[in-house]
Regions:
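A donor-sugar binding/catalytic signature common to diverse glycosyltransferases
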Residues: 1, 186-230
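Short, solvent-exposed loop/turn segments at secondary-structure junctions
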Residues: 1-3, 38-40, 77-79, 116-120, ...
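Active-site and donor-binding regions of nucleotide-sugar-utilizing enzymes
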Residues: 1-83
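Structural alpha-helical scaffold elements that stabilize or flank donor/cofactor-binding regions
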Residues: 25, 104, 193-194
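Conserved acidic residues
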Residues: 30, 109, 196-199
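Hydrophobic/aromatic beta-strand patches that form the interior of the parallel beta-sheet core
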Residues: 31-33, 72, 148, 200-202, ...
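Conserved catalytic-core segment of nucleotide-activated headgroup transferases in glycan assembly
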Residues: 61, 76-170
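Nucleotide-activated donor-binding/catalytic signature segment of Leloir-type glycosyltransferases, i.e.
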Residues: 163-187
Length: 232
């Protein structure tokens, strides 16, 4: 999991992510690599507090030293992989290229549209209304921008079982979008390709936001409450 950066001095934010620090994998691993030095400070502070609270000051220092040696803030392998990958290295399907290329051979701006499971569960019909509106706007502007819609891979399994009525409507939207063929629908396992290929990110808040920002892509998080306008 890639977390948004948290200020080690922000007690409320640290409290909200403590459960990531205390999972068995962190306790049992020989080495733990986290995404930044700030994140390392948080892990060290949390784990020292959790494991040394009833110890003497001298013992607390030893325990802190143990966590400082164990936790490495050198970065996320996921981020590193995305940063190393160039557009020229990508294998882009021909059907995608047909959407991306303009008649003169130049490329349209590619917008990575990411939709999440949590937004659908939380907002239900509002998300469907938002989806229809987003697809309408990109359909109308398809000569200049190519939409690369990549829903979270667990949407089908989760929504179909928990909200079957919502799933039926959602599935109709997906089928219509794919049949019309003016945009890209990415249901592959390769999320890195979408991040590297795109010119900007739009959609729900997720761990992919940080990856896109690290890659230097502009990011806009959608507001499901705003519908019927070309801008948010």
């Amino acid at each position: 999991c890639i977390l948004g950066e948290v200020d080690p001095e922000n007690k409320k934010a640290v409290e909200g992510m403590k459960h990531f620090c205390t999972v068995p994998a962190v306790i049992n691993a020989d080495k733990v690599i986290v995404q930044s030095e700030d994140m390392r400070r948080i892990y060290v502070n949390v784990m020292t507090e959790e494991t040394a609270k009833n110890e003497t000051p001298e013992k607390q220092k030893e325990i802190r030293k143990y966590w400082e040696n164990k936790i490495d803030g050198s970065g996320s392998p996921k981020v590193d992989k995305v940063l190393r990958t160039r557009k020229e290295d990508l294998d882009i399907p021909e059907e995608w290229l047909r959407v991306i290329r303009k008649p003169d051979g130049s490329r349209k701006k590619i917008i990575f549209y990411n939709t999440s499971v949590s937004a659908l569960l939380q907002h239900g019909e509002k998300v469907l209304e938002k989806l229809r509106d987003v697809l309408r706007i990109f359909r109308e502007n398809q000569e200049e921008a190519a939409l690369l819609w990549r829903p979270h891979p667990l949407i089908k399994a989760t929504i179909e079982s928990m909200r079957p009525g919502l799933w039926e409507e959602y599935e109709k939207l997906v089928e219509q979008y794919r049949e019309e063929g003016w945009g890209i629908y990415d249901d592959t396992a390769d999320v890195d390709r979408a991040i590297v290929l795109c010119d900007a990110y739009y959609g729900d808040h997720s761990s992919l936001v940080r990856l896109c920002r690290e890659k230097g892509k502009p990011v806009m998080v959608q507001n499901v409450e705003v519908v019927g306008t070309d801008a948010e």
